[in-house]
Amino acid sequence: MAIRKYKPTTPGRRGASVSDFAEITRSTPEKSLVRPLHGHGGRNAHGRITTRHKGGGHKRAYRVIDFRRNDKDGVNAKVAHIEYDPNRTARIALLHYLDGEKRYIIAPNGLSQGDVVESGANADIKPGNNLPLRNIPAGTLVHAVELRPGGGAKLARSAGSSIQLLGKEASYASLRMPSGEIRRVDVRCRATVGEVGNAEQANINWGKAGRMRWKGKRPSVRGVVMNPVDHPHGGGEGKTSGGRHPVSPWGKPEGRTRNPNKASNKLIVRRRRTGKKHGR
């Protein structure tokens, strides 16, 4: 993938860039693997906003991705196409299995049309192959990693991300996350070899607010520029600092939003570096 920069013909195009989509081999998705996707604009069943800054955006269809791959062990698959997916930053690969079934997977870096991938404990260590962690050598970069055996891939699924397998001890494997956190995971959990493709996604300059609106993201307004009725930081004559420690629109202090008693915390060997005091 490469990035194509626009000429500064308008203020919105000045500095803006876009993917050249050179790796895409087909523009229409596999119809049998597409499901309707209905936007809710951040509203719940009562019509109340539960997630702010969402709404609008281009219509999308959901592509069904195989995040498990545990029922195709020993069945080879050929990469038929590399496709664009509007629901994620990574590209997706359409696999044609030898038994006739078609499935989507997240496309790793280096996977191209015509390649053959497989899954199972005896699969080769090459990009796109899916194996249990116990069968992957230490030092290997992997993605689409399960947190629980058979639970489906949860970790390292976005563009350019990868996890390094540091080692294995007893029934656990030590993984270095993209955040720098080191976590232990059951060796029966499966992972896909390689790193996720489309790494240049992080370097795209969106250029204008309108491109964010196309993605369904609405403006995020600071509390200090609101009125007192709308936010605890609102009001005041002229510019103010808010007058208090940062809080949410409902008065709750910022930070420390994670559950300190989460059961899986005991599997964290080293926490990620946050750059803030008190481990927030």
Swiss-Prot record:
Classification via InterPro entries: NA-bd_OB-fold, Rib_uL2_dom2, Ribosomal_uL2, Ribosomal_uL2_bac/org-type, Ribosomal_uL2_C, Ribosomal_uL2_CS, Ribosomal_uL2_dom3, Ribosomal_uL2_RNA-bd_dom
Presence of the UniProt keyword rRNA-binding in the record: yes
A single MF term (Gene Ontology): structural constituent of ribosome
Role played: One of the primary rRNA binding proteins. Required for association of the 30S and 50S subunits to form the 70S ribosome, for tRNA binding and peptide bond formation. It has been suggested to have peptidyltransferase activity; this is somewhat controversial. Makes several contacts with the 16S rRNA in the 70S ribosome.
Record key words, sorted: Ribonucleoprotein, Ribosomal protein, RNA-binding, rRNA-binding
Region feature (Disordered): 27-58, 226-280
Family: Belongs to the universal ribosomal protein uL2 family.
Keyword RNA-binding found: yes
Protein name: Large ribosomal subunit protein uL2
HAMAP family: Ribosomal_uL2_B
Subunit-structure text: Part of the 50S ribosomal subunit. Forms a bridge to the 30S subunit in the 70S ribosome.
Biased composition regions of type Basic residues, renumbered to the chain: 37-58, 268-280
SUPFAM superfamilies membership: Nucleic acid-binding proteins (SSF50249), Translation proteins SH3-like domain (SSF50104)
GO BP of this protein: cytoplasmic translation
GO cellular component terms, semicolon-separated: large ribosomal subunit
